[in-house]
Amino acid sequence: MLEKIQETADFLREKMHTSPETAIILGTGLGSLVHEITDKYEINYKDIPNFPVSTVEGHSGKLIFGKLGNKDIMAMQGRFHFYEGYSMKEVTFPVRVMRELGFKTLFVSNAAGGTNADFEIGDLMIIRDHINFFPEHPLHGKNIEYGPRFPDMSEAYSRELIDKALEIAKEKGIKVQQGVYIGTQGPTFETPAEYKMFHILGADAVGMSTVPEVIVANHCGIKVFGVSVITDLGVEGKIVEVSHEEVQKAADEAQPRMTTIMREMINRI
């Protein structure tokens, strides 16, 4: 594993014209944030040694280097999901590579179903904590020397970055929610009974990604900020049939607000 991480990092280091310290993982319908990136240099996943290739509609599969505002960044346009058949080691491989390249901060975004009755479709939810409901843990097996055997997860999402996001949202007049995200393996959307269970467990939103990458980022000592776009509701009386296309549409409509918050945050760190 370490040899593959180092091989991939060496390959990317040769292609990089700058030394960014901020990375962004873009989820379903949120890939259009890349239009905000200037001085772009793109590498297709299929051309990167040891990188998996995303198979999901709406995830184009590129690594993008450039500037967001005045900061050098790297963006993953398309992520890898456990439900695609990848192991957790493969799902989180890019985060290990980020650590090897010296990244300090990771911004993650996703589309999620809301279980909180106060939420509406299109809301942005700042993730303040998560529940890991995946059947396999990304740190299972021999510990990689990037972090401790038993990592602390008491601040999986940086409180400093959360406070900064709330400040920016207030300045810009953008409505945001806060809550707990629960990560499940998918690929089915949740049944009404599952939504109810997740709410009882303490989740405000549910999705099929993010948690594995955040766990590994914490293991590597990378600070994390996460935001979910609420694309459907699992609240009694508000549950409707949902499709991937509808999820993408809702995420696309929320994208300008998320872009504003992300851009401002990255410029201020």
Regions found by a protein language model. Give the residues of each.
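Zn-dependent metallopeptidase/amidohydrolase metal-coordination segment
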Residues: 208-246
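Metabolite-binding pocket within alpha/beta catalytic cores that recognizes anionic/polar moieties
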Residues: 1-153
